[in-house]
């Protein structure tokens, strides 16, 4: 009985998780403060939205298994990555307005990806505990000694 009470007290309720809009705004602020550092994660093969989510979960003390979030990434990266590549390749051939339109669409795809990650997160049984999500992710990328190391909780 005591173990059940302990488990119930440590379990994270869905309402404690970030909302899509709240997380989008938080991500924009955190990303904007150190955009180049977050882009370094991307250049090392990582996903910025995932890294931001893992950092946010660390701040909340919620550990998560990266493999549980992988399907959401696979689903959204199938659309996002080709669009990003197309935008980058077209940059020199487009006028400012056309390029900004492509960039705005990419940001909408980024927002969609965040929403899918959060939706996936809401389906998981999450518990409070020692959360080193960002550290583990950066370690997988070989980037744990990079510019974001000070964010590791």
PLM regions: where:
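Short runs of predominantly hydrophobic/aromatic residues within well-ordered alpha helices
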Residues: 20-23, 46-50, 114, 131-134
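Contiguous interface-forming segments/domains that mediate binding rather than catalysis
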Residues: 2-23, 62-65, 96-106, 121-129
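A charged, amphipathic interaction segment
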Residues: 92-153
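Short alpha-helical "patches" and their helix-cap loops
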Residues: 40-43, 63-79, 129-133, 153
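Amphipathic alpha-helical segments within well-ordered protein domains
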Residues: 39, 54, 87-88, 118-122
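An acidic intrinsically disordered interaction segment
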Residues: 2-32, 78-88, 110
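Structured binding/interaction patches within domain cores
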Residues: 60-117
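N-terminal interaction modules that seed assembly of large macromolecular complexes
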Residues: 32-70
